[in-house]
Amino acid sequence: MYETYHSGWIETITGSMFSGKSEELIRRLRRGIYAKQKVVVFKPAIDDRYHKEKVVSHNGNEIEAINISTAQEILNHKLEEVNVIGIDEVQFFEDDIVNIVEKLAENGHRVIVAGLDMDFRGEPFKPMPKLLAVSEHITKLQAVCSVCGSPSSRTQRLINGEPAKVDDPIILVGANESYEPRCRAHHIVAPSENEKEEM
C-alpha cells in the first residue's frame, strides 16, 4: 500500500457534454465540505449558462463559485488556508492554467478540475491534454449517445438542428439547445463551405 503524505495533487474529471462532469466535481467538493475542509471553487466568466456565481450541473445541483476571466486571477485569492480547490469548465482557460494548477498542488492543495477533453470537432480541447498529463487522478465519464444509446465520447454541436461546420468557432457556450452527446459512429462534423465547393 502507498504511504500518503500531506502534499497536494491534481484530479481531472473529463468527458463529453452531459456525462456528469460538473455533477462529479460538485460531489467531490461537497465531500470536502462535509469533512470540514476549506473549499474554494472557480469557474470561467464565459460560462454563464445557468448562474454567474455558481457551478450548476445540467440536473440542477449547484455550489457557490468565484467567477474569473483568466486563470491568473486564481492566484489573487488568499488560498493559504484552503484544502480543496475546484475549477469547472477548465477547457475555457488558456494553457497557463496548467502551471497554475501544478503550483497549487505543489503548495499542498487538492486541486479538482473538470472539463471537456475534446471540442465539437473531436479534437483535444486547449489545455486538457497537458492537464491530463500532469494529473495524479483521472476520471473519464461518458454520456449516452442521443442517436443510438451507446456510450458517448463526443460532443455534437448543432446549429439550427444541423451539424456545425469544421471551421465554426471552437467556443460556443450552450447546453442542450446547441449540443448532444454522441458516440464515435454518430458524431458528425460538416465540411466548411470551401471544402463543399471542392467536392
Swiss-Prot record:
The active site is at residue 89. Zn(2+) binds at residues 145, 148, 183, 186. InterPro entries: P-loop_NTPase (IPR027417), Thymidine_kinase (IPR001267), Thymidine_kinase_CS (IPR020633). The keyword Cytoplasm applies. Keywords: ATP-binding, Cytoplasm, DNA synthesis, Kinase, Metal-binding, Nucleotide-binding, Transferase, Zinc. It comes from the Bacteria. GO terms for cellular component: cytosol. It is found in: Cytoplasm. The keyword rRNA-binding does not apply. ATP binds at residues 15-22, 88-91. Its main location: cytoplasm. One of its GO terms (biological process) is DNA biosynthetic process. It catalyses: thymidine + ATP = dTMP + ADP + H(+). GO terms for molecular function: ATP binding; thymidine kinase activity; zinc ion binding. Its EC number is 2.7.1.21. Pfam families: TK (PF00265). Homotetramer. HAMAP family: Thymidine_kinase. Belongs to the thymidine kinase family. This is Thymidine kinase. It comes from Staphylococcus epidermidis (strain ATCC 35984 / DSM 28319 / BCRC 17069 / CCUG 31568 / BM 3577 / RP62A).
